[in-house]
């Protein structure tokens, strides 16, 4: 397969995930921030799926704040991507390739999140 590229919308969702982390005062970018970034991107396949499921960005942000807490809003997350978020990106690349796609879109990132849940629940 030729070089796989992230679409503009996928790149925007990843940037938005960083912004969400900073807004919430978290020092890392986790799967929760990626999900919120996908929802906030607004136009990609993932955003449409999330909207059709009734998951709106502000309600997701409120749920994250309740579950994880809120720190002092700041700049870029100092700790970068969590291991789980890195795994999600890896899974999205794998899924895109498996589907024969030469790009990684928001749909692949959402698939990566879902697949990471399956991997977490598997016995070791």
Predicted feature locations:
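Histone-fold recognition with a strong bias for associated Lys/Arg-rich disordered tails
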Residues: 1-121
């Amino acid at each position: 397969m030729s070089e796989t590229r992230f679409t503009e919308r996928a790149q925007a969702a990843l940037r938005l995930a960083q912004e969400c982390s900073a807004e919430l005062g978290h020092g890392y970018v986790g799967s929760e921030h990626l999900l919120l970034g996908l929802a906030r991107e607004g136009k990609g396949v993932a955003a449409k799926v999330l909207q059709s499921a009734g998951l709106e960005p502000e309600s997701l942000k409120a749920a994250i704040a309740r579950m994880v807490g809120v720190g002092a809003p700041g700049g870029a997350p100092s700790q970068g991507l969590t291991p789980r978020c890195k795994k999600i990106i890896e899974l999205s690349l794998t899924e895109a390739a498996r589907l024969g796609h030469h790009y990684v879109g928001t749909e692949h990132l959402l698939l990566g999140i879902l697949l990471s849940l399956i991997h977490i629940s598997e016995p070791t």
